[in-house]
Amino acid sequence: MAKVQVNNVVVLDNPSPFYNPFQFEITFECIEDLSEDLEWKIIYVGSAESEEYDQVLDSVLVGPVPAGRHMFVFQADAPNPGLIPDADAVGVTVVLITCTYRGQEFIRVGYYVNNEYTETELRENPPVKPDFSKLQRNILASNPRVTRFHINWEENTEKLDDSNPHMHPVLSIEARPSASKGWPMSENSLNVMLESHMDCM
């Protein structure tokens, strides 16, 4: 049984300009004291074509963590535009929140992210070189995809085989505020793209 359960994720400052930091309010519960730190990461998927464009925006160690319910705001700077292919700057991508214990990832929460120009003229005639200062980022906070992995939580034991992750489409999620208009891709296309990054790496 997992010793940590993520109860709630609130997407803050959404929608927002591209260069604003990502902010997530995370609530989790430990069923017993943890002797080592939890490592949380925020990962931005720069391109659906290859994981080489993934950017780890930030990582933070939390712990040792006593039993009980805990909440913190995880903030990370916007991705480096220079590492995002021009063809993937505008449109839908993915941001991931992951957590590991003793180097083993046990949960991954993925959100669709839509980057688009707010000005009508730029939407109709987008520049060849993306202007990130004019882009707005909109996280689809109402539709996260959650994958949980089986790991060994105890000391001095071999790592469990986590090659068969359990996908859960629903987590208690809130947004302040959230919006889902203007998404240019079909739901099937979005699911294929997100699930490709929700597999165990």
Swiss-Prot record:
Keywords, in A-Z order: Chaperone, Chromatin regulator, Nucleus, Transcription, Transcription regulation
Quaternary data: Interacts with histone H3 (including both histone H3.1 and H3.3) and histone H4. Interacts with hira and p60.
Gene name per UniProt: asf1aa
Protein species of origin: Xenopus laevis
GO molecular function: histone binding
Gene Ontology biological process terms in this record: DNA replication-dependent chromatin assembly
One family name in Pfam for this protein: ASF1_hist_chap
Cell compartments where the protein resides: Nucleus
A cellular component annotation (GO) from this entry: nucleus
Record keyword Iron present: no
Source organism phylogeny: Eukaryota, Metazoa, Chordata, Craniata, Vertebrata
Transcription regulation found in the keyword field: yes
Record protein name field: Histone chaperone asf1a-A
Family the entry assigns: Belongs to the ASF1 family.
Task performed by this protein: Histone chaperone that facilitates histone deposition and histone exchange and removal during nucleosome assembly and disassembly. Not critical for histone deposition during nucleosome assembly.
Domain of life per record: Eukaryota
